[in-house]
């Protein structure tokens, strides 16, 4: 028999789209962090969730076309980490260009500027990189405005590299 906490956590996960990324703090309104952690670990063991990183979980998304589960969205994982640590993040470099559709190059490292510390996370073949910037550089602007500001800087570097300048 499920406890009230377990049932509420599971209902929230069931109500989310496949591929949704969760962190422990997403359930702070339901239970304390230890109870949440135990419940998320249990749901991982039964296959309802997939652990991406310590404290970061995904409701797996299955592709009928590929006949397998698809990889976690790195941008969604970055946003979940930012949510968990109360960081403000903005994609930069090739990540910004890709998210705006200005580059078709597959980025090897998903890069973000952040008001948090310099930090790198890796899982499977995916790497997230957070670069510290002062609050004034990234706070107070909408996500899209910040993204648009970051993209031209990256685009200029990309074009210079392509033309050999």
Question: Predicted regions span which residues?
Answer:
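Protein-protein interaction interfaces in oligomeric scaffolds
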Residues: 135-138
